[in-house]
């Protein structure tokens, strides 16, 4: 899972306890996909990997917690999208 973070489009955090990495390729996928998730020490590792590879990190606590409940490699439901 951690190996997917450098390929992520964004990492959403809560800001210290939860982290989820999402990927999205417009035209290739119908929705963003959850590719990595972690809590506490794994969340810190995801944030560190994102920083090391220039992946944007966004603090959005309610969204991070909601997405963390999802299984890896699943599409993000449209209710979590924002234009």
Stretch-by-stretch model annotation:
Residues 1-83:
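Divalent-cation
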């Amino acid at each position: 899972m951690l190996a997917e973070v450098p390929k992520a489009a964004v990492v959403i955090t809560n800001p210290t306890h939860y982290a989820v990495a999402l990927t999205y390729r417009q035209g290739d996928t119908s929705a963003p996909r959850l590719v990595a998730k972690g809590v506490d020490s794994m969340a810190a590792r995801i944030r560190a990997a994102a920083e090391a590879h220039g992946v944007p990190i966004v603090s959005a606590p309610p969204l991070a917690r909601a997405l963390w409940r999802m299984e890896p490699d699943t599409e993000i439901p449209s209710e979590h999208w924002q234009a």
